[in-house]
Amino acid sequence: MGPEVLLRLDRDGPEPLRAQLEGGLREAIRAGRLRAGERLPSSRELARQLGVSRGLVQDCYGQLYAEGYLTARVGSATRVAATAPARPAPAPAERPAAARLDVDFASGVPDLAGFPRADWAWAVREACRTVANADLHYGDPRGDRTLRRVLAGYLRRVRAAVAEPADIVVCTGFAQGLGLVLRALSRSGVRAVGFEDPGYGQGETLAAVTRLGIEAVPVPVDEGGVDVAALARTGVAAVVLTPAHQSPTGVVLAPDRRHALAAWAADRDAVVVEDDYDAEFRYDREPVGTLQGIAAGRVVLLGTVSKSLAPAMRLGWVVCPPHLTEAIVEEKRLSDRGSPGLDQLALARLIESGRYDRHLRRMRGVYAGRREALAGALARHAPGLRLTGLAAGFHAVLHLPEGVREADVVAAARERSVGLYGMSDFRMSGGTTPGQLVIGFGNLGEPAIERGVAAVADLLTGKPGGHAD
């Protein structure tokens, strides 16, 4: 009995098709209707049988593979795992160990206490007061038209982007936005995509790329940003970049490379996916405009409020080149029925009112103070160490002395209840040389920064001699 007989998808129901398909397959496996070792149809065949996109089926298979329900090997069929779980894995009872650290220098975390609660509450009230009844129905998969209009104006004004409301797709953050773009590219025949190295490392982002059947190709980064000549040698037809503030090195893509990248995309008929990471927080000068602004027809621009407001917001956007808009909108439509409508309208009100800009100005001051606190603490407790990437964002790169092993420092710091994170986490190879640490300070007050640096200073310098309590 094949899955096409076991599954019924309700296209008019409130549950997204992907969730229905995943749930139906899980239940069929747990109930024994799909037995251990049984072969499942290919993603292409099941998509045809169910009348859904192949990308949706690939995502479902990938999720169930990760949960242990399915097995697959390159060149062979997807099958029900011999030891498929009898029930979904229970949710963890507590936060990961990092939550118990006294000082956690994790990168990518903004000041959670700085979330503008009063302004957001005002924006939500305004959204509820002014929303039209018709806008409470299922809407355009691109997102709320008011937010798309406001975002287009904001991105043109602040990021020098070429943005029209019709070409903006609202999503639930960077992960979904990138997934939409990559699925659209995959459907057009793209099989390999370049990624900055160091960049996303071996984490969830690249695992998701692999599940789509796309090869992630490393492209080296140096002090000028991504190496465009090396990119050209890979032969890929798409690349994902963080040009405004490279994650994690903190460098800005050099002007000559910006133009070389635009020329490469035009000559290769390639697509550049621009992750506008940390662009709001620049300390030494005005932020550089988007790459999309000089090559709009070749660049997909991704942005979110996860760093500017809070990760829990789950709101982002994709500014599509016109030739990709329809495909990306279709992927969004197949993924879900759209992002939360009232939250979208509230964000539009927050931006229109000027409260969002005011919040960003305030947070720039907060992060600038913490940036100075980090540099000062290192100068006092571990003088002579090189710190780079401080011109923007809320993390920096600490270069360890020769002979000091990154992994040893990370492990020993954790014994002292301090979370440190090596550059190896961000390298696709996992390599640990040269030894570097990515030091996040966004969610740490200045006293915690001082305390954390003092606690591990001897580890950083490789000169044992005790540490401050």
Where are these regions (language model features)?
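Active-site PLP attachment segment
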Residues: G293-A327, S339-L342
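Hydrophobic residues in well-ordered beta-strands that form the structural core
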Residues: F195, P218, E274, L347, ...
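Helix-loop "lid/cap" segments that line or gate small-molecule binding pockets
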Residues: S107, L151, W317, L345-S353
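Residue-level detector of anion-binding/catalytic polar loops
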Residues: L70, E215, V271, V418-G419
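N-terminal basic, amphipathic alpha-helical segments
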Residues: M1-A127, L136, R145, S188, ...
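Conserved core of the PLP fold type I
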Residues: V124, R129, A134-R268, E280-R282, ...
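Short glycine-rich anion-binding loops that position phosphate/pyrophosphate groups of nucleotides
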Residues: G108-D111, P243-S247, K307, L444
